[in-house]
Amino acid sequence: PAPRGLCRGDKVGPLRPSMCGIAGIFRLPSARGLSAHELGTLVRTVAHRGPDGEGLTYLGTRDGALGEVTAEGDWTVGLGHRRLSILDLSESGRQPMQLGDQPLWISFNGEIYNYLELRAELEALGQTFRSHSDTEVILGAYAAWGTAGIARLRGMWGFMLVDGRRRVAVLSRDRLGIKPLYYRAWDDRLAVGSELKQLLALPGVTARADERALSEYLATGYEDPSRTFFDGLVSLPAGTYAELSLDTLRLSSPASYWAPERVQVTVHDADEAAARLRHVLAEATRIHLRSDVPVGCALSGGLDSSAVVVLVDQLNRREATPAPLHTFTATFPGEAIDERR
């Protein structure tokens, strides 16, 4: 069936959010404050991001090794997650997730589009997987390649990965910063979240303006990628990762794993350029369609979304049982912002 917009009276089921929510607390054994109750607050504050489940994991040192403990135990790492199921809808895909019996845990928001290719590569190296999720592939990539594995990911993400062997937590965001990751640091503890309001919900954190960030934005129109408009609340810059020592809670300076390159492209004529663009766009669209739930498209009156919808429809028609493609348009009749134009 051809793609079409939705009309009044159409029934397509409830609309779902397009994100998960992550939360984390890291603290020294001597730290006071930020208890299991506060981790629950961080998670509940973003309940709207993940309607499909909630998970909490507490980690502490036992016999010299990091492992799971109870909320009432002597924990120093708390990971939380609100789940929106897109890949592997079973309980095997729930988070926070551990990689088998290895001391690697993750809370992840986003989607890794090339997870099937990475999974095949990791299986060739001898790794086995318990789920069909992209989350487990991130853990596997880190186990195989360390932080160098981050550059192999194609997708959008914000995650916290805890490495019990190295006793570090790795925080990372995707190349363009599509998915957010914020944190608030004290001397003896650090809190992480997907949204600023999670951190603002913590005791002792006030919504005080960062006057320097505001003045720089008003003067230049640009934002510092590592700052927010709230004093003390920090954004991890896009395209970077940072390592947090679990023993000292010292956070490294963000390290870039990617930067756009200037590429010299040579084409002989407009037809060749169009063919190459179509190939690249079709390939990107194809891997973005990997999902275990129905996929829809936002459709405005512009060329970008129209081209994507046409490609999605063409790819969909190649399937044995094509699914209806629903498109969504923000319409404001008579207004300049009407997206049908």
Where are these regions (language model features)?
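Cysteine-centered catalytic environments shared across enzyme families
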Residues: R16-R341
